[in-house]
Amino acid sequence: MERRTFLRGAVIGTSAATFGGTLMRGAAYAAPAQNGPGPYGALGTADANGVQLPSGFTSRVIARSSQAVSGTSYTWHNAPDGGACFADGTGWIYVSNSEINPSGGASAVKFNSSGSITGAYRILSNTRQNCAGGATPWNTWLSCEEVSLGYVYETDPWGVNAATRRNAMGKFKHEAAAADPVRKVIYLTEDESNGCLYRFIPTTWGNLSSGTLQVLVAGTGTSGSFSWSNVPDPDGSPTVTRDQVSGAKRFNGGEGCHYANDTVWFTTKGDNRLWQLNLANSTYELAYDDSLVNPGAAPLTGVDNVTGSSSGDLFVAEDGGNMEICVITPDDVVAPFLRITGQSSSEITGPAFSPDGTRLYFSSQRGTSGSSSGGITYEVTGPFRTSP
């Protein structure tokens, strides 16, 4: 397998390396990632919030489903899922999807420069099973419906402009989105056991009202070269998008997606893999596969949402597993970064860093109750590294 290039940069959202166009410097990245000691050391005992963290890190709960967000009158949504952060003057905004059907959507929490909550509000309503999504360079949040023939909705993190359904981005079981400001495209994962990876090329970059939907075409192996082919009917009817192009590569349950200059990473839950597209030479390969971890048991299972930090580390959330967010370093080590205890019927969702990279936001979708009304959204603060 060829060596990979892991590209570093500031990340301010679930899928962006960035969506703001920050370029990343390269480093050799051998593959696949293997079990080893993480850069932050061992996890400590669970804190008052039930979160095990490395030394120097602390957690706080910023919102609970069905309860008013602290300091506001806004009731936080059920089943919090994918999320991203957006700079807002000296503060920032964290947006979060609601993965329920019907009456899904997305909400936002606003913070000032000291991290205090200053507001919370709805940015999308009455949609279905809003799972993950992605930020854009023009500071909107793409909220994806994880239902058959689902849509992508473009939303305003400030809640000023009405959300817009982006039909041209295709109707399928959407999961996540990642914008590539260099090629001016948006990559889209599909949560089907025989799903595909797509890219959307807007007619005009910054305007998602029209454009071309393409699907990745490649062989059946875990590495090789790839190309893109137009999807004839993005509407997906009568033939679903994944069955319209001969040779479209199949992926077992597409989940999170993350772009860093010239590289796309995305997870597949059906086989616990993290894939990598090397855009500069149009090749693909595995960045992680839990069945290839040696020695010892794989620390990362139930792969789901993925984001990155300014050090070049990837942070991958578990759907189930033992409720961890694991870190994959540029030198191919995978290790737990945090673990949530007492919530075995939940999953971790929506990891996203604040614009300055010092705070990590995420949710436990069903919390201690195992119910969508029991979701908990967290913030972790600490000495996140800025270089490998």
Segments from the language model and where they lie:
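N-terminal export signals
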Residues: 5-28
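Beta-rich, blade/repeat-based domains predominating
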Residues: 74-89, 126-137, 171-185, 246-263, ...
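Conserved beta-strand positions in repeat-built beta-propeller and related beta-rich domains
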Residues: 94-102, 143-146, 188-191, 266-270, ...
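Loop/turn-rich, solvent-exposed surfaces of beta-rich toroidal or solenoidal domains
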Residues: 269, 296-333
